């Protein structure tokens, strides 16, 4: 319980510098959040096996969807899909690569990506799209959490590499990673995409959750 709690605290600390603005009075066609908050009117999901992307819409208004490999690369000249009203819609995007989308209606626009990544690791989630009390959003594709990275397939690693993932912080103990207890606990080393340049070990043991060493590591930002 303490371990899970601390993981959340660390992730929120790291997220403090990755917010983007949402200006309610911004009427320009920009790549980002603007106008009315419509972030809850649509969502992206991907099939875990095929990695096929689907858009789910929960608004009766006409809408447009634009796509790019990152928020900065979204092509606003040509929508990848348009519609009028609610429904689920298959997306013609590369199944092997991550995409970020901009969903737009007459009322506003919002960035979208799949919350639960289509990989074999349990509960691998993007923490992007979360709105804070100041009306700003965590950037998609900048901060993730997962319970494990030792069961990744080659397809999973290729997909994760397309996110540009660079830093991984492992909270597990040496025994959890290397195995122990006379073989009762098998070794479970992480499988990391080629883009990762900064792997960190930050062991969380019972009793050291709020130790000076842990707090100091967090304060330095692990970068």
Task: List where the protein language model places each region.
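Outer/extracellular conduits and scaffolds centered on Gram-negative outer-membrane beta-barrels
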Residues: 11-14
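C-terminal motif of bacterial Sec signal peptides marking the signal peptidase cleavage site
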Residues: 18-21
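Bacterial N-terminal signal peptides that target proteins for export
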Residues: 1-9
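Cys-dependent protein tyrosine phosphatase-like superfamily
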Residues: 23-223
């Amino acid at each position: 319980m303490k371990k899970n709690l601390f993981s959340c605290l660390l992730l929120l600390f790291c997220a403090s510098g990755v917010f983007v603005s949402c200006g309610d009075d911004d009427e320009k066609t920009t790549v980002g959040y603007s106008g009315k908050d419509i972030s809850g009117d649509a969502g992206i999901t991907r099939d875990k096996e095929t990695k096929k992307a689907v858009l789910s819409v929960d608004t009766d208004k006409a809408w447009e969807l634009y796509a790019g490999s990152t928020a900065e690369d979204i092509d606003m000249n040509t929508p990848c899909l348009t519609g009028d009203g609610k429904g689920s819609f298959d997306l013609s995007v590369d199944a092997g690569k991550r995409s970020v989308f901009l969903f737009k209606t007459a009322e506003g626009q919002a960035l979208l990506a799949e919350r639960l990544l289509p990989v074999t690791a349990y509960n691998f989630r993007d923490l992007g799209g979360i709105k804070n009390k100041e009306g700003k959003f965590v950037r998609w594709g900048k901060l993730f959490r997962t319970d494990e990275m030792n069961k990744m397939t080659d397809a999973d690693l290729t997909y994760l590499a397309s996110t540009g993932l660079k830093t991984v912080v492992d909270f597990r103990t040496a025994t959890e990673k290397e195995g122990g207890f006379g073989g009762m606990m098998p070794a479970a080393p992480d499988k990391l995409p080629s883009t990762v340049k900064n792997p960190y070990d930050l062991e969380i043991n019972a009793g050291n959750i709020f130790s000076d060493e842990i707090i100091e590591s967090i304060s330095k930002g692990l970068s």
